[in-house]
Amino acid sequence: MHEYSIVSALIEQCEQHAQANHADKITRVDIKLGVMSGVEPSLLQTAFDTFKLDGICNAAQLNIQIQPLVILCQDCQTESVLSERTVVCPACQSFRTRVLDGEDMLLMQLEMEQNED
């Protein structure tokens, strides 16, 4: 299950941001997950809940925004937003399309807290 290695890298990235901002705690992690990313949201959530226990993210809530697939047809120049995993243009049925969005997983926002000593 590659979700474990993805979550490990995500938590490491969160820890780096927290350290750079002198934060002691991360309370929320917002990510954008493309439908073509190859990552299963429920497995990602389970992996996050498991890995967060031993670090600065232990109280963090993971919010996953699913990013639909956005394609541009090279034949008819139609830009389409698709919720399913297909690269066929719905306007002209061409396979000559380019993916514009929906393939990545991106860290969008962190909510952090600092102790006031």
Swiss-Prot record:
Molecular function terms from GO: nickel cation binding; zinc ion binding
NCBIfam families assigned: hypA
Tagged with keyword Mitochondrion: no
Protein residues bound to Ni(2+): 2
A single GO BP: protein maturation
Keyword Metal-binding assigned: yes
Domain of life: Bacteria
Role noted for this protein: Involved in the maturation of [NiFe] hydrogenases. Required for nickel insertion into the metal center of the hydrogenase.
Family classification: Belongs to the HypA/HybF family.
InterPro entries: HypA/HybF
Residues reported to bind Zn(2+): 73, 76, 89, 92
Protein name: Hydrogenase maturation factor HypA
Gene source species: Shewanella baltica (strain OS195)
Keyword line: Metal-binding, Nickel, Zinc
HAMAP family linked: HypA_HybF
